[in-house]
Amino acid sequence: MYYGFDVGGTKIEFGAFNEKLERVATERVATPRDDYDKLVDTIVGIIQKADNDLGCEGLVGIGLPGMEDARDGSVLTSNIPAAKGRFLRKDLEAKLGRTVTIDNDANCFALSEAWDESLQGEKSVLGLILGTGFGGGLVFDGHVFSGMNHVAGELGHTRMPIDAWFSLGEKAPLFTCGCDNKGCIDNYLSGRGFEQLYAHYYGENLKAIEIIKLHATGEAKAVEHVDRFMEMLAICLANIFTGLDPHVVVLGGGLSNFELLYQELPKRIAKHLLSVAQVPKIVKAKHGDAGGVRGAAFLNIKK
């Protein structure tokens, strides 16, 4: 049995999956954001209950908005203050007497999609989230590639390519990132970036869904904004694809619901790739909010 946890800033979602990768148990509770002992006890309690209900000791995987420090195993996260700097994996293993695997929630999203029946035959799958932030995860042969420092897939903290910057025109804003660097693509390619770029150019604070609805009516500012955003996004993705050369790209997050992406991106990206390179297949995520739990559970599958 495979146990998966999606530990977020407001809730903990749990799922148990059998050998056929079918979900057989679910639980959702509030995240004890500021009480570390309660956070650990909550996770342990859910696991022990699942063990009793299912009659086995499941393999435990946890996805969270952050990562483990590759040097000492401490948790690096800002969304769950109680866990920041703590040794969550080691403390859970000590209480449970079994191995626990922890990974970034974007990696879990990518793994969930890579294990979908439609993609299991693909050699490599790049999952990209265009939500509150921009990030991703890379899966090779059914397993997450995290890199030496556990930061592989932190694509949002790469910098804007110069031609993407030029595509924004003379009034291009230089946003400062939460990591204290300037020009990180997280602040431009995310849903949040989509909104703050619109506010920068047009002086109006609109939600992404409002801008997209205006675009559908042919409203001039929205049409101009979407065209500029698409070109910038295409250049940045071409840059990423040139370095990683994935077989399939799966888009998640709020902006992934904008159907125009799947029409526009392939032809725009093609202009910015090497002449010998083909644009990888770009598809919409299938598992939505369940992806984090699925991917966390599948961290322990040995393909």
Swiss-Prot record:
Residues that hold Zn(2+) according to the record: 157, 177, 179, 184
Pathways involved: Cell wall biogenesis; peptidoglycan recycling
GO MF annotation, one: zinc ion binding
InterPro entries from the UniProt entry: ATPase_NBD, N-acetyl-D-glucosamine_kinase, ROK, ROK_cs
Keywords for this protein: ATP-binding, Carbohydrate metabolism, Kinase, Metal-binding, Nucleotide-binding, Transferase, Zinc
GO BP annotations listed: N-acetylglucosamine metabolic process; peptidoglycan turnover
EC number in record: 2.7.1.59
PROSITE patterns with a match to the protein in the record: ROK
Record field: catalytic activity: N-acetyl-D-glucosamine + ATP = N-acetyl-D-glucosamine 6-phosphate + ADP + H(+)
Database matches in HAMAP family: GlcNAc_kinase
Family classification: Belongs to the ROK (NagC/XylR) family. NagK subfamily.
UniProt-listed NCBIfam families: PRK13310.1
The protein, known as: N-acetyl-D-glucosamine kinase
Originating organism: Photobacterium profundum (strain SS9)
Lineage: Bacteria, Pseudomonadati, Pseudomonadota, Gammaproteobacteria, Vibrionales
Gene (name only): nagK
